[in-house]
Structure formats: structure tokens, C-alpha cells
Amino acid sequence: MNVLLVVPSTDTCYERVPSMGLMNLYLIGKELGCNMELVDLTEVSYGKGLKKILSKQYDIIGISCNFTNSAPNCMRYAKDIKEKYPDTLAISGGNHATLVPEDLLFNNYDFIIYGEGEITFKNFLERRLFNKAVEDLKGICYLKEGKIVKNKRQDLMECLDSLPVNDYSEFNLELYFKRSGLRYISLETSRGCPYNCAFCSTVRMWGHQYRHKSPKRVVQEFKIAQELNLEFIFIEDDDTALDEQNLRDFCQLLIDENVSVPWGMGIGSASIKEESTFDLLVRSGCVKVNVNIESANQRIMELYRKPYSIEDNRRLCWNLRKRGILIHNHGIVGFQDETIRETLNTYFYLIKTSPIWHVSILEPRPGSDYWENWEGQGDVFQYRLFGKANVILGKHKIIPYVLYRIFALFYFSNPIRIWRALYSKGKGVRYSYRIQYFVAYNTLKQNIINYIRHFNLFLIKRNG
């Protein structure tokens, strides 16, 4: 059975890294004896990407629809695939596909694998290999007589160590490295979150149960990365420190096994309780920590249902800064009734606490509190605006829009920041500064493209 997995063409502003999720599915398919192929079309135009997909016939084509700004292209693929190969099954999965399956099922997709997908994907392939029906499988959605059927959710994986060990042979890693200027990959070491932040969809995708790979397994993946002569690894978990003892055991094992790849991670402001954990981070090679403070206003923090305080973040930043670990604080502005003073509080707090910081404008992401009442559902033009500081929920939309761009101008024109992006000693640290310029450039480029699209649509409507 021939199976193609696709990372879709996407209007993204962010760096391009290999898809860990599709790598898992690719390796699962290989273990079952399927002829698996994987193609990354992230930076390829829709037309060129479709040409690659249609270059041969497959039994199953799986399109990852993880981000809302990738949905417009994902919504087109199945129709175009079936025009040439009507017998090919078109399936999808990922965050957006899980939370808004109607966007894909009503656009010619046969099945959606929703939520955590590895077990369901394996069961799906096994059924198809023996020409058995798949409609009763847990974890899938499909259309029946024009209505969406959503089967019972698949049980969560209890042991993440059972996931396939990373194998990068299907990726031309040198292309990723050349684009970023750094031999860098990201890893997933945990899933799930016990919290329920208002703007987040993590629990809708991965559940409330926090699960993690064992320290031994993560160190094994670090060793694989070290054999590839990588210069930096970033752990892409929502909060790598939710189980602090597991983090400590991992750091100690890195030290004991003499693994020397510089690395970074994302954590919550109150997750590390023991001060000695910070010392272990330094000794194990951690050079950067991303922290989601979200707002410098306690009122808004509570409305976001954040499980920590501004004081927790101050304490964390102080402990990291004292040990020379680079801090990357993240904030969100644009809450519905946020005042100018509150918006400025967040900006100036980030400037004060973090050498690197990033601000997002609050978006109505699928699965968040703000999605259900958002008027842009199903609108591909609105979807393309996600991730580019253009989808704004607040009453005073112009304020976060303008302030975002003013602060970005001063942030990126800072000569100290430019110097650090060019000459910081550590490659991982230098990359952390430089990638923000890459994202800013792409954001500006994508905004210009979207403005042109919007203007053309306006002219078409005006001229009838």
C-alpha cells in the first residue's frame, strides 16, 4: 500500500523545521510494511506542491492541517487530488483538522484522524491493508449522508516512549539548516496540560493528562541529534518543567552521559520550585528558556486563567538571568476590553525582564474560548491572516494593531539587538536573536501580500 504524508503549503512567518508528528506516522507506516513517502511543501506554492503530490498515484494521501493559516490550502488539496485519482483516500489530522473537521470533510476529505493520532493511524492502515472497514475506529470523523460522524475519542497513549525513535532519513536536513543558518531541530518530549488557559487549544488536542517521555528516551534522542552534529535543540513542549523531578533527572542524565548539544525549552512561570534545578539546567547545557507570561496585568492573567502570577514570572526571570540563561518572554495583547495602559504595561514589562521577547495579538484560535463567537469561521481569507498580528478581537482594534507595529520598529532597530543577532558567541543564542528578524521580515512580506489580496477583492466587489 502506497501512502504519502504531506506538510502543506502554508502562509507562515516562522522558521521551517521537520514535522515530528508526521515523522511518527511515517515510521509507524514503515513498521507495518507500507510504502511510505513524506514531502514538506511549507515554502512551496500551492500549484507546485500539488504537482508533486499528483506526480504518482497513492492509495492514501494524508495532509497535515495543524495551523489555521494552513487550512486554506488544505481545504483545496482533496478536491484536486480526487479529480485525477478518484480512488485515492484523502485523510487529514492536526490541530485545525481536529477542532474544525467540517472545513475539510465538506471539501472532499474522506476521513479526519482527530486528537492524538498515532494509535488511530496505525489501526487505520492495518484495516486498509486487509481491505477492512474503518468507519467504526476510535478517533476518526467522516461524512455520512451529509452529516459529520465523530466516533469515540481514541484512548491517550500512556507511555510516550512507545513512539518510534526519531529517524531523519526522509528529511533533507541540510535544506532546513541552510535556511535557518543553524544546525537545529526541535523535539517533543511531553503531551497534555493540567491547565485550561482561555486562549489555548492544547487540552482539546492532547488532553489534560500530562505525559512525558522518560529521561533515558529523551537523552537517546539527544544523542541521535549529536551524531548529526547539531548546534542547538529546542524542546517544543508547552511546559517541559511540569514534572520538575523528571526535568531534573533528564538534566542529570545529560550530564552523566556527556551529551553536549546546547538546548532550550519552554516552561511556565511557576513550574520550577527548587532553585537547584536552575543550576542543573546550566550544567546540562540549557542556554535558552521560553516563558509565557502572557500579560503584565493580573486582571487579564486571571481572565486568561493563567495558573501563576506576575511575581512568579519575575522570580523565574531573576533566577534565569542570574545564571546566564537567555530568557524569551512571550506576551499577548488585544484582550476584548484591554486598555491602552494595560497594553503598555505588558510591553514595558517584557522590555524590563527579557533581552528577547515576543508579543502576539490575541487570536480566536480553534478550541479557545474565543472561537465559537468569531464571525470568521470558514473564511479562508480570515484564516490566512492568522499568525501575522492581523486577527484582532478587542473593541479598540486599531490600538493593539498600531502599538504592535510601533514597538516592533523600535525592537528591531535596536543596535544592541542587531549586534547580538550577528555576533553573540553561542550559536543557539545568536540564532534566537536572528530568527526574530527572519520572522519579522516574513510577517511584513505576508502582510503586504494579504493587503494586496484584500485590495483586489475590494476592487472586484466594487466593480460587480
Regions found by a protein language model. Name each.
Residues 12-13, 101, 195, 245, ...:
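Flexible glycine/acidic-rich beta-alpha junction loops that bind and position SAM and/or redox cofactors
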Residues 10-20, 66-71:
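A short, glycine/small-residue-rich beta-strand->loop->alpha-helix junction that serves as a flexible
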Residues 2-8, 30-31, 35, 50-60, ...:
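Radical SAM enzyme core and accessory elements
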Residues 25-159, 367:
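Glycine-rich beta-alpha loop elements in corrinoid/cobalamin-binding modules
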Residues 103-120, 280-288, 346-359:
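Structural recognition of alpha->loop->beta junctions
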Residues 7, 38-42, 204, 331-333, ...:
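Residue-level recognition of beta-strand->loop/alpha-helix junctions
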Residues 161, 166-328, 348:
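Radical SAM [4Fe-4S] cluster-binding motif and immediate context
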Residues 8, 41, 93-95, 238, ...:
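Cofactor-binding loop segments of dinucleotide-utilizing enzymes, especially the Rossmann-like FAD-
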